[in-house]
């Protein structure tokens, strides 16, 4: 009887039959007979590995998406056959821990701001106070299970009001100069009234330009000639006010430039801007006593009063040219290279004091010092026989 198994084994070996796997290799079937282990979410804060706490951008993002480059999809997925790790379910707790870790980073970034993003300018109450005193989802959210992240220290008070936004357009030097002009007590401008009559704030400059066609169209004087505007600092000559004002900006420093709000008028003198603003408002306080003429300053009134006089104060010494205005005499002297004669008073008597500055920019004649007149008189008396 004892020889029968040996004979059977010998016959099986001669027949080419393979032995049973459980008899020859018992270690290959051992893991299959054991009950599968199920991975559960740990509740202790100290049981997290370094790989699980690496942050949202390392493993948490890949674990949330079943991509081919993810570690969880390669190592923990039951579909991978070459993995040497312990098998675990496909949907584990890594996405929750990654989101919790991301929330902690966002809280640290929010606490590092010097002001609250939810607090509007001028409103000092914190919008997050109600959140601190009210029941929050943080008490039961998965972020409480995540390991503590690095929290930076805040730079300042978290309830500080954020700084106000800068104006849409930076304040230009000419705008600051014009504001100083209005703050100086000029009583001719209504600050509460908009510049435009159509209710629009500011009322674009182009609309105001069209109200005065003389700005863009050349004007004709009483003699039928085109009126020109000559620059006093160079040889530039313009035929319109607009082109002349644009050229004047080249000779005025930005910190001294004064601009009109209703037109492109520019100047560096405060009283010139005041006279110009009176023209816009229709305010002409200087009235002529002999006609209905009115103007914005006394200099213009004095020039107008000469039109009612029969005395030609300014004359040429080389010809019979005579005029009532000093500027007209200067143009004549420059053109023909003549010399001026003695200036007359309004009553027609000679006046030795005024000096005609032919090539100067001064409006009107200069006044000769009395000491020079006395020296001239004494010199003529000494040379006389």
Swiss-Prot record:
Subcellular location, principal: nucleus
| A GO cellular component entry from the record | nucleus
| Keyword Repeat carried by entry | yes
Q: Name the source's superkingdom.
A: Eukaryota
Recorded GO MF terms:
DNA binding; zinc ion binding
- A biological process (GO) annotation for this entry? segmentation
Alphabetized, the UniProt keywords read: Developmental protein, DNA-binding, Gap protein, Metal-binding, Nucleus, Repeat, Zinc, Zinc-finger
Q: Where are the zinc fingers (C2H2-type)?
A: 229-251, 258-280, 286-308, 314-338
Region annotated Disordered sits at 1-94, 124-216, 361-385
Task: List the biased-composition ranges (Basic and acidic residues).
Answer: 126-135, 173-203
Subcellular localization(s) per the UniProt record: Nucleus
| Segments of skewed composition (Polar residues) | 374-385
Biased composition (Low complexity) is annotated at 63-77
Q: Which family does it belong to?
A: Belongs to the hunchback C2H2-type zinc-finger protein family.
Its annotated function is as follows: Gap class segmentation protein that controls development of head structures.
Protein name, as recorded: Protein hunchback
Please tell me the species this chain comes from: Bombyx mori (Silk moth)
Q: By which gene is this protein encoded?
A: hb
């Amino acid at each position: 009887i004892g020889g029968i198994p040996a004979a059977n084994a010998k016959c099986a070996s001669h027949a080419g039959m393979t032995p049973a796997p459980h008899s020859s290799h018992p270690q290959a079937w051992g893991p299959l007979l054991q009950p599968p282990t199920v991975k559960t979410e740990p509740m202790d804060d100290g049981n997290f590995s370094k790989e699980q706490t690496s942050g949202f951008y390392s493993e948490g993002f890949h674990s949330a998406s079943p991509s081919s480059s993810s570690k969880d999809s390669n190592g923990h997925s039951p579909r991978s056959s070459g993995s040497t790790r312990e098998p675990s379910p496909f949907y584990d707790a890594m996405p929750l821990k990654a989101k919790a870790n991301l929330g902690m980073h966002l809280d640290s970034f929010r606490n590092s701001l010097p002001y609250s993003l939810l607090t509007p300018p001028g409103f000092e109450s914190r919008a997050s106070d109600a959140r601190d005193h009210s029941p929050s989802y943080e008490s039961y959210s998965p972020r409480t299970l995540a390991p503590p992240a690095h929290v930076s220290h805040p730079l300042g008070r978290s309830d500080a009001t954020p700084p106000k936004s800068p104006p849409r357009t930076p304040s230009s030097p000419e705008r600051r100069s014009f504001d100083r002009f209005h703050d100086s007590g000029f009583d001719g401008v209504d600050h509460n009234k908009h510049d435009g009559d159509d209710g629009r704030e500011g009322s674009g400059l182009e609309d105001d330009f069209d109200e005065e066609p003389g700005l863009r169209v050349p004007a004709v004087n009483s003699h039928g000639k085109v009126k020109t505007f000559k620059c006093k600092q160079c040889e530039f000559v313009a035929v319109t006010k607009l082109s002349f004002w644009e050229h004047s900006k080249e000779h005025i420093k930005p910190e001294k430039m004064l601009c009109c709000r209703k037109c492109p008028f520019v100047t560096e003198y405060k009283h010139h801007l005041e006279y110009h603003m009176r023209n816009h408002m229709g305010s002409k306080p200087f009235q002529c006593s002999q006609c209905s003429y009115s103007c914005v300053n006394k200099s213009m009134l004095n020039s107008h009063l000469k039109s009612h006089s029969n005395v030609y104060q300014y004359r040429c010494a080389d010809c019979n040219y005579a005029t009532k205005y000093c500027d007209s005499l200067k143009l004549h002297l420059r053109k023909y290279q003549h010399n001026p004669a003695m200036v007359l008073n309004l009553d027609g008597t000679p006046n030795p004091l005024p000096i005609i500055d032919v090539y100067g920019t001064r409006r009107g004649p200069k006044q000769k010092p009395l000491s020079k007149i006395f020296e001239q008189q004494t010199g003529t008396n000494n040379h006389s026989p």
